[in-house]
Amino acid sequence: MAKQEDVFKTIVAHAKEYGFVFQSSEIYDGLSAVYDYGQNGVELKNNIKRYWWEAMTMLHDNIVGIDSAIFMHPTIWKASGHVDAFNDPLIDNRDSKKRYRADVLIEDEIAKIDDKINKEVAKAAKRFGDAFDEAQFRATNARVLEHQKKRDELHQRFSDAMNANDLNELKQIILDYEIVDPISGTKNWTDVRQFNLMFKTEMGSTADGAMDVYLRPETAQGIFVNYLNVQKTGRMRIPFGIAQIGKAFRNEIVARQFIFRMREFEQMEMQFFVRPGEEMKWFDYWRATRLKWHKALGLGDAKYRYHDHEKLAHYANAATDIEFEMPFGFKEVEGIHSRTNFDLSQHEKYSGKKIQYFDPELNQSYVPYVIETSIGVDRMFLSVFCSCYEDQDLGNGDRRVVLHFPAALAPVKCAVLPLVKKDGLPEKAREIQHKLRFDFTCQVDEKDSIGKRYRRQDAIGTPFCITVDHQTLEDNTVTLRHRDTMEQERVNADDLEKILAEKVSLNSLLKKLL
């Protein structure tokens, strides 16, 4: 079995070869941790965003959208805490000259211990079969108990250090547990220090009159400072939400794993405003609702899990991540946070403007509490792409690479393929494509043999191929090929719109959420 890192490299190469993701500025040797989306990637990305947007704003009468500016008044970032607290604990290895997040190194060590425990459990389950009692095994096996004790002690020290913001203790943990640099294999570490992640620039026509501004590190603050505008003009009543999709920027020192961690990325965020005291009810609601949204895609329920935060952000009183099993392990794709009334209260304090809501049912005014759902578009893209990629053995030495995208997310919904480039078949193919293109992303592919064209469409995840042959000219029927099964059926060309609408419509996906 190929190593997971080799599988991931193959997936990344496929993304580039078939027009999904390119290294930005590639002809100038690229720019680290910055990527461009190609012709197929932008379609997949837009479909993911549309699925999220409609699940938020169409399925919820009390959620509306905005699009706030990237540049905002610099005092906003002072009020939000980003100027003082938006830092990562970084550590360098003197031998490899590489820089790492200290907390991630320790989290990876905890994950390694978890893997050892799980391997012991898996071996025992295989040995004992149906008679295996996992709970009893975990509670009594000496090796498992030894690993678990080490894991619990490490986890407790790590949690205490993070909550106390104790950088010296973070380094001591790395030394005590003999955590080595993954490249050099050495333990020659520097001290841990904090690094602010915001990009800073200037706005103004002259150097003397310029104002320091920041590229926003998150989209949430654009929602908070527009809370009053939306609430008043939309006559919104608590509880209600504001959704936004937009770019954010972080000067990630440790940017890695392709588009998983980038310096320029896109977020889909929704801030849900609730009564104080009801935040945990709504936190639980959105925690479950967001996981349901992910699982509706059919990528595999076992690939998802919750990860509750040990250390809470400065604004939160509850937080959990939805993690997805990437080729490089379970990683966060979405965060759900109870942000209390921190943000609105801070903006009320720093702006001097009253940011409160009068609740007619309670006959009182208050600063609303906020439940946030925040998902990285690029991470979502990567989770979909990785889970849908398959190098399939068809037998007799034949293989194909296929992307099993959910049909509603596929960049190209159907391809019309004339069997040969003569006898009026290309013209008929164009006629069919022209009818379908108003409702579906549809392309005509004439080059190469029909088999090669099928493989090409499989490689970009096209759910259906429509083959036009000589019989089409006689009775107006075409061959409809299904991507995942490769099965073919004969259908009337006039029925294609109806058939495709049932198979690839986003509505069919959204209805699973009701």
Located regions from the model:
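NTP/phosphate- and nucleic-acid-binding module
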Residues: 1-514
